[in-house]
Amino acid sequence: MLLCSLTLTLLWMVASGLECDVKEVCLGSPGIPGTPGSHGLPGRDGRDGIKGDPGPPGPMGPPGGMPGLPGRDGMTGAPGLPGERGEKGEPGERGPPGFPAYLDEELQGTLHEIRHQVLQSQGVLRLQGSVLAVGEKVFSTNGQSVNFDAIKELCARVGGHIAAPRSPEENEAIVSIVKKYNTYAYLGLVEGPTAGDFYYLDGAPVNYTNWYPGEPRGRGKEKCVEIYTDGQWNDKNCLQYRLAICEF
């Protein structure tokens, strides 16, 4: 019985102390706030916001390094005003020789018409024997005797050339004029770079000759050709005075 009373007393004491502890924890006044804690870890990035308005242009930066590649050519502009006339340039180089006149069909047609007109307008001279027509050629003289260069200039001035026979018939026509004036005449032939080789004035090689036996023998010193009253040829220097006979 004593043991029972002691047990009850202990139980009551335990029960009483427990009630007191509970009251101190649950029913006491708030304590002093604690110190702030340290910052936590950064949170995740938020979503992109709405695009803002463009800002004002910034100042021009310094020049870059190497220049860029050239751009494409622009469109052609309007023509400018004509410039002043420049000074006359130096003469150009001599061009290559042209084709001989006898190979130009159009030129031959023109010459044929000229010959026809000459024959019609020079009828009086033809009666005097100063104009002779042979085939497609017309030979004429004014009766004057001058040197080779003067004859060449005279014939060119009237639209012709120094008479140059290319057949026996043409040679005989020239002889008839030479006999009429009882003198010699220069022919339209000149010696080339090689002694003894003669050419027409247009540069074509001679295709008909009637040299006096042993001629030519000037050995490059006699560059021109004269025709005798018998129709034979002789090489001669170009400074002698001979009858001027032109061909058209």
Curated annotation (Swiss-Prot):
For this protein, the record's SMART domains field holds: CLECT
Annotated region Disordered: where?
Answer: 29-102
What ranges does the record list as Low complexity composition bias? 69-82
Q: Where along this sequence does the record place binding of Ca(2+)? A: 215, 217, 234-235
Which InterPro entries does the protein's record reference? C-type_lectin-like, C-type_lectin-like/link_sf, C-type_lectin_CS, Ca-dependent_lectin, Collectin_CTLD, CTDL_fold
Q: What keywords appear on the UniProt entry?
A: Calcium, Collagen, Disulfide bond, Extracellular matrix, Gaseous exchange, Glycoprotein, Hydroxylation, Lectin, Metal-binding, Repeat, Secreted, Signal, Surface film
Which segment of the chain is annotated as a signal peptide?
A: 1-20
On subunit structure and binding partners, the annotation says:
Oligomeric complex of 6 set of homotrimers.
Q: Where is the composition biased (Pro residues)?
A: 54-65
Report the residues modified as 4-hydroxyproline. 30, 33, 36, 42, 54, 57, 63, 67, 70
Sequence ranges assigned to domain C-type lectin in this UniProt record: 132-248
Main localization is: secreted
The reply on keyword Manganese is no
Quote the subcellular location field of this record. Answer: Secreted; Secreted, Extracellular space, Extracellular matrix; Secreted, Extracellular space, Surface film
Instruction: Give glycosylation sites per the record.
Output: 207
Q: What else is known?
A: Pulmonary surfactant consists of 90% lipid and 10% protein. There are 4 surfactant-associated proteins: 2 collagenous, carbohydrate-binding glycoproteins (SP-A and SP-D) and 2 small hydrophobic proteins (SP-B and SP-C).
MF (Gene Ontology): carbohydrate binding; metal ion binding
What job does the chain carry out? In presence of calcium ions, it binds to surfactant phospholipids and contributes to lower the surface tension at the air-liquid interface in the alveoli of the mammalian lung and is essential for normal respiration. Enhances the expression of MYO18A/SP-R210 on alveolar macrophages.
Q: Which cysteines are joined by disulfide bonds?
A: 155-246, 224-238
This one is known as: Pulmonary surfactant-associated protein A
What are the Collagen-like domain coordinates in residue numbering? 28-100
One GO BP annotation is: respiratory gaseous exchange by respiratory system
Entry similarity comment: Belongs to the SFTPA family.
Query: Domain of life here?
Result: Eukaryota
Output a single Gene Ontology CC term carried by this record: multivesicular body
